[in-house]
Amino acid sequence: MNEVKSVGAKYIALTGPTASGKTAAAMAIAQQHDVEIISVDSALVYRGMDIGTAKPTVDELAAVPHHLINIRDPLQAYSAAEFVADAQRLIDDIAARGKLPLLVGGTMLYFKALFYGLDDMPKADPAVRAELASEAAAKGWPALHAELATVDPVTAARLAPHDSQRISRALEVFRVSGQPLSFFHQQNAAKTIADDGREERTEILISLEPQERSWLHHRIAERFDAMLAAGFVEEVKTLRARGDLTPDLPSMRCVGYRQAWELLDAQEARSPGGSFPMDELRDKGIIATRQLAKRQVTWLRSMPQRQIITCDTDQALPLVLQAVAQHIEKSSR
């Protein structure tokens, strides 16, 4: 299952942790090559979530054709399986029109699903998820984390007691299948085929990765400050005011949105109409974004076929453009 799959046409994939400069690099590639961009970002699919997702600007969207952005209402889910189907269709369509598909984003699960296929584990069960959400509301997520530790200690050991999304999925898998989530991960790992010796691929995965974490942390803080200045809290207030969204939805679990929603709830309970704790949101949002970046880097290390470009140097963009040009020349021979 983990042998890299052909998706029909050659393409270029550009990834890296959040705030590593993927959008700027993609736009630079687009200036030199006739590309269409396919977003590989589970947050950018949602309409009305522009500021907190660092969505490409109106000018950027107009300058280069983009796909898989603004395709879902925040009330809807969008799975890795749906992404793979959409991405494969778009790759073939873009290539058929004589253009180069450029996949850009940091949702590593999507990349892994596209490259290697999906894990052979149980599908989501809405009834079980609702049951778990009800139990969590009554007992709290730490209690469900403790339950997980009894049936799947391997998975529980790597999850925080309040990691609701992952605790819910792990317990859901166990209740549906009778097997722990770690069992399916082990089965998948056993099928992994080493990259060495694979046939030459017609795709390339470029990964922007910093040498110094402090550089990335500074960029994350700068970007979150810019989001706050651009009206991120008002964006979350607008989403909450719809009345049909809840903090348990995948859209509202996105980094930044979850923290803002929780603080807005706390403010209303404590002092309706009082001042919003902007400094607290800044701290929580930056910490959560750093944690996201750390998880993304961990995912990247499981993709040995990637071509690493050090992004915290002045040569990052020239090196990306060079790698793209060399790959296009090589694959056209």
Curated annotation (Swiss-Prot):
Which Enzyme Commission numbers does its entry carry?
Answer: 2.5.1.75
Q: Which cofactor does it need?
A: Mg(2+)
Tell me the name of the encoding gene: miaA
Read off the SUPFAM superfamilies from this record: P-loop containing nucleoside triphosphate hydrolases
Which residue ranges traverse the bilayer? none
Naturally occurring in which organism (per UniProt): Polaromonas sp. (strain JS666 / ATCC BAA-500)
Which portions of the sequence form the region Interaction with substrate tRNA? 41-44, 165-169, 253-258
Which positions does UniProt annotate for ATP binding?
A: G16, P17, T18, A19, S20, G21, K22, T23
**Site positions for Interaction with substrate tRNA:** T107, R129
Binding locations of substrate: T18, A19, S20, G21, K22, T23
Q: Which GO terms describe its biological process?
A: tRNA modification
Q: What class of enzyme is it?
A: transferase
**Its biological function?**
Catalyzes the transfer of a dimethylallyl group onto the adenine at position 37 in tRNAs that read codons beginning with uridine, leading to the formation of N6-(dimethylallyl)adenosine (i(6)A).
Which Gene3D superfamilies does its entry note? 1.10.20.140, P-loop containing nucleotide triphosphate hydrolases
Give the protein's recorded name: tRNA dimethylallyltransferase
Q: Species lineage, top-down? A: Bacteria, Pseudomonadati, Pseudomonadota, Betaproteobacteria, Burkholderiales
Q: Which NCBIfam families match?
A: miaA
Q: How does it assemble?
A: Monomer.
**An annotated Gene Ontology molecular function:** tRNA dimethylallyltransferase activity
Q: Which UniProt keywords apply?
A: ATP-binding, Magnesium, Nucleotide-binding, Transferase, tRNA processing
